[in-house]
C-alpha cells in the first residue's frame, strides 16, 4: 500500500506539483519497494520446508529479474506505442503519458495487496520466536545511519550551490553578450559568430567565471573594425581558457564529493568492526554482532547489492563512449535487458532444487536452464524489435556460468568464491579491453552476481542460533550498499573516466571472494561444516 500511495502522489505531483514533489513521490515508491524486498525473503522461506527456503528465494528472485528484464520493453510500449524510439521522442515525451503509466503501476500494486490480504492459503508470515535485545548494537547502527546522512549532505548540497552560481554566471554572460552586440559595427555579424563559439565551448555546469576571465571579456566590448584580428585571437584564447577552467573546477568539485562518499563508506566499515570487537569483549547488549561471520556477511550483502546495481547504473554511460560505439540511448535497451536477464538466468538455475529432481535430472537441468533462460532473453527482445545480433555470442559467458555451477556443486562457500573469482576476471577483462569484448565482460557481472545473495545469507547466519532472526534483519539492512557504491563509481567516473571507474566492481568482487575464503575458517572454529551442513542453504 505504501507503493500505491507513492504512485498516487506521483500522479498528483506530475499534474499539480513541482520537482520536489516528484522526488518525494519517488522516495515513497522506493521505500515501498525496499519494504517489499525486506518482507519477501522470510515470506518465501515460510511458504514451505525451511531446508529448501533459499531455493524458493532464488525462484522469486528469478521472477523478479524476469520482470526487470521485460519492464523496459513494456513501459516503452506503454509510453510510445512502439519498442523502437529515438532520442528525440524521449526528449519530447509528454507528462500525460507518464501519468497514465504511474496510474497503472498504482493499480497493479493495489491488486497485489488485495490478493495477499484475502488469500486464505498463504502463511501468516509472523515468527513466534522472540528477537533478542541488542541495545548497544542498535545504538551503533543509529549513529552510523546519522553519520551517513551527515556525510552525504555536503555532497548533495554542492549541487545546489553550483546551480545557483550557474544562474548568476548565465545572467552575466547574457548581459555581456548583449553589450557586445550593441557595440558591434559592420563586422558585427562575424564577431557575433565568433563570440557565440565562446558560449558553445563553455560548459555552464561549473562555477562562476574568474575575475580575470570577466576582465578579459569586458575588454572585448569596446573595439573598432581595425582590431578585428586581435579580437578574433582574443575570443579563441578565452574560449580555450574557459574549457581549461571548466575541467579544473569540475575535477576539484567531483574530488570533493568523492571524499564525502568515501567518508560515508568508511563510517559503515568502522562501525561494524567496532561493534564486533566490543561484542567479543562483552556480549551483553550486542546481540548477533558478536559473530564475525555475520559482520563480514553484512559487508558482503552491502558489497553484493552495490556491485549488482552499479554495473547496470553506469552501463548506459559506458556504452555511449566512442570506444564502445557511441551508442545512442535508444539502442542501449537490449544490453541493459541482457544484464538483468543474466541475473534471471542464474536464479532460475539456483531454484532447480525446489522441484526435487533426481541427481541426473538436476545436472541436466543445470546445463539446460541457463541456456533456456538466455533463449528467453533473446526471444523477448527480438519480439520487441530489438537488434540482438551483437549479443548472440554472449552465450559463451552463459557456458562459463554453467561450468561454475558444476565446479561449486551447490556448496555455498565454494560457490561464492568461484563466482566472485569469475566476477574479478570478467571486470579486469572489461577494464583492459574495449568494444564488444569489454561489453560482454561487464554484462557477465550479472551472471556471476545472480546466485550470491542466498550464499552470503546462508553463510552469515550459520551458527547464530537464537540470534538468527536478528542477524537476518541486520543483513537485510545492508542493501543500502545499492545507494552508496553506485554514487561512488559515478563520482569516480567524473574524475578518472567511466571505463576506468569499473575498478569499483573489481574491488567489490574481491571482497566477496575474501568473505568466501574467510568465513570458512570462522565457521570451522565454531565446529560448523560450512559446506556439508549448509548445502541446503544455497
What are these regions (language model features)?
Residues 35-49, 312-315, 450-465:
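Intracellular juxtamembrane helix-capping segments at the cytosolic ends
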Residues 112-121, 382, 405-409, 506-538:
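Multi-pass alpha-helical transporter architecture, strongest
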Residues 250-260, 295, 324-339, 363-368, ...:
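Loop-to-transmembrane helix entry
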Amino acid at each position: 500500500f505504501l507503493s500505491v500511495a507513492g504512485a498516487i502522489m506521483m500522479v498528483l505531483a506530475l499534474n499539480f506539483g513541482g520537482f520536489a514533489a516528484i522526488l518525494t513521490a519517488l522516495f515513497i515508491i522506493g521505500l515501498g519497494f525496499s519494504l517489499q524486498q525486506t518482507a519477501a525473503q522470510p515470506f518465501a522461506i515460510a511458504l514451505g520446508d525451511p531446508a529448501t527456503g533459499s531455493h524458493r528465494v532464488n525462484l522469486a528472485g528469478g521472477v523478479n529479474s524476469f520482470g526487470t528484464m521485460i519492464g523496459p520493453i513494456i513501459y516503452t510500449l506503454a509510453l510510445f506505442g512502439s519498442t523502437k524510439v529515438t532520442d528525440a521522442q524521449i526528449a519530447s515525451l509528454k507528462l500525460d503519458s507518464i501519468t497514465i503509466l504511474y496510474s497503472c503501476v498504482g493499480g497493479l500494486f493495489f491488486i497485489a495487496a488485495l490478493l495477499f490480504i484475502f488469500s486464505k492459503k498463504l502463511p501468516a508470515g509472523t515468527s513466534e520466536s522472540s528477537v533478542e535485545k541488542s541495545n548497544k548494537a542498535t545504538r551503533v547502527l543509529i549513529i552510523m545511519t546519522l553519520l551517513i546522512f551527515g556525510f552525504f549532505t555536503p555532497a548533495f548540497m554542492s549541487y545546489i550551490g553550483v546551480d545557483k552560481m550557474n544562474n548568476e554566471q548565465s545572467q552575466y554572460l547574457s548581459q555581456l553578450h548583449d553589450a557586445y552586440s550593441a557595440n558591434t559595427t559592420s563586422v558585427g555579424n562575424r564577431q557575433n559568430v565568433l563570440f557565440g563559439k565562446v558560449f558553445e565551448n563553455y560548459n555552464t555546469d561549473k562555477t562562476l567565471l574568474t575575475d580575470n576571465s570577466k576582465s578579459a571579456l569586458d575588454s572585448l566590448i569596446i573595439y573598432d573594425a581595425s582590431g578585428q584580428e586581435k579580437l578574433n585571437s582574443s575570443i579563441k584564447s578565452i574560449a580555450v581558457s574557459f574549457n581549461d577552467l571548466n575541467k579544473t573546477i569540475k575535477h576539484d568539485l567531483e574530488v570533493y564529493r568523492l571524499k564525502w562518499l568515501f567518508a560515508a563508506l568508511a563510517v559503515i566499515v568502522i562501525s561494524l568492526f567496532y561493534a564486533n570487537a566490543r561484542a567479543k569483549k562483552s556480549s551483553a547488549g550486542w546481540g548477533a554482532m558478536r559473530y564475525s561471520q555475520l559482520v563480514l556477511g553484512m559487508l558482503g550483502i552491502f558489497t553484493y547489492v552495490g556491485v549488482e546495481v552499479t554495473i547496470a547504473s553506469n552501463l548506459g554511460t559506458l556504452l555511449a563512449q566512442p570506444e564502445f560505439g557511441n551508442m545512442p540511448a535508444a539502442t542501449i535497451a537490449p544490453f541493459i535487458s541482457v544484464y538483468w536477464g543474466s541475473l534471471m538466468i542464474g536464479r532460475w538455475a539456483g531454484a532447480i532444487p525446489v522441484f526435487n529432481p533426481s541427481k541426473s535430472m538436476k545436472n541436466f537441468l543445470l546445463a539446460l536452464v541457463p541456456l533456456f533462460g538466455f533463449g528467453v532473453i533473446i526471444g523477448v527482445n527480438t519480439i520487441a524489435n530489438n537488434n540482438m545480433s551483437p549479443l548472440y555470442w554472449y552465450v559463451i559467458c552463459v557456458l562459463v556460468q554453467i561450468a561454475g555451477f558444476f565446479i561449486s556443486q551447490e556448496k555455498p562457500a565454494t560457490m561464492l568464491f568461484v563466482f566472485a573469482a569469475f566476477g574479478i576476471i570478467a571486470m579486469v577483462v572489461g577494464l583492459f579491453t574495449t568494444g564488444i569484448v569489454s561489453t560482454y565482460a561487464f554484462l557477465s557481472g550479472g551472471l556471476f552476481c545472480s546466485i550470491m545473495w542466498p550464499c552470503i545469507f546462508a553463510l552469515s547466519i550459520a551458527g547464530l542460533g537464537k540470534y538468527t532472526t536478528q542477524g537476518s534483519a541486520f543483513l537485510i539492512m545492508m542493501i543500502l550498499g545499492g545507494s552508496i557504491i553506485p554514487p561512488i563509481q559515478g563520482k569516480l567516473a567524473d574524475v578518472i573516466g567511466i571505463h576506468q571507474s569499473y575498478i569499483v566492481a573489481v574491488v567489490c568482487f574481491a571482497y566477496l571472494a575474501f568473505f568466501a575464503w574467510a568465513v570458512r575458517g570462522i565457521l570451522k572454529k565454531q565446529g560448523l561444516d560450512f559446506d556439508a551442513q549448509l548445502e541446503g542453504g544455497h
